[in-house]
Amino acid sequence: MGLPGLFCLAVLAASSFSKAREEEITPVVSIAYKVLEVFPKGRWVLITCCAPQPPPPITYSLCGTKNIKVAKKVVKTHEPASFNLNVTLKSSPDLLTYFCWASSTSGAHVDSARLQMHWELWSKPVSELRANFTLQDRGAGPRVEMICQASSGSPPITNSLIGKDGQVHLQQRPCHRQPANFSFLPSQTSDWFWCQAANNANVQHSALTVVPPGGDQKMEDWQGPLESPILALPLYRSTRRLSEEEFGGFRIGNGEVRGRKAAAM
């Protein structure tokens, strides 16, 4: 499945490039990755390298562990060089380290920072979970909309809307670095919910919040403005690693899940 995700940039200042142009600032080469597809033990990844300062053509090499050259490309413009790579889970994290090597026509070259892909794609815990509940009314009656997103964590990340009794109401597994968006009808009396984000490294959940606010007030008694955030939730953390059974049990998609309890915190 195609996953559009956002780029994660790692930039390292170079020690030398073309000595003939000393008036330029110290050149840099950046390396970035984008997860295109997720497999059980692999990731189809787009890696880009860019050195914007030296004049083209620029020769880019994608190198792996022990400086082994994986791919090479000559770019005649200032556009980044792109490399498609099937990154598979290795026994040693050191085997999944990549960096860009850029050289100009003068023969000078510069390296990028190292990308630790094992950490990025398999072992990075979910962190900095943010959840926002908003009451919206676009003419068809009020609906509660929730945005749930962790700022980092290895894919795939499963996001869940959970009631205070542990009942999982909705689940999504969004694209890498994209938020989960939940929408549901509010009940006539307030209820309590939280957002949970989980990957194969850990589980993190936000604090319980009442939706809509006002305790046990009736919906018609609540006079808060529509289309304004109800609450941005703080987070609690759990560093317990999920078992394959727990992680594999999550459902993918936007449908309602009945009779399922959330993973123990």
Swiss-Prot record:
Organism from which the protein derives? Homo sapiens (Human)
Q: Which residues form the signal peptide?
A: 1-20
The cellular component terms of Gene Ontology attached to this UniProt record, alphabetical and capped at eight, are: external side of plasma membrane; extracellular space
Is Signal found in the keyword set?
yes
Protein name per the record: Protein IL-40
Disulfide linkages recorded for this protein, renumbered to the chain, are none
Q: What does this protein do?
A: Probable B cell-associated cytokine that plays a role in the regulation of humoral immune responses. Involved in lymphocyte B cell development and immunoglobulin/IgA production.
Transmembrane stretches, start-end: none
- Subcellular location field: Secreted
**Any Pfam family:** Ig_C17orf99
Keyword match Secreted? yes
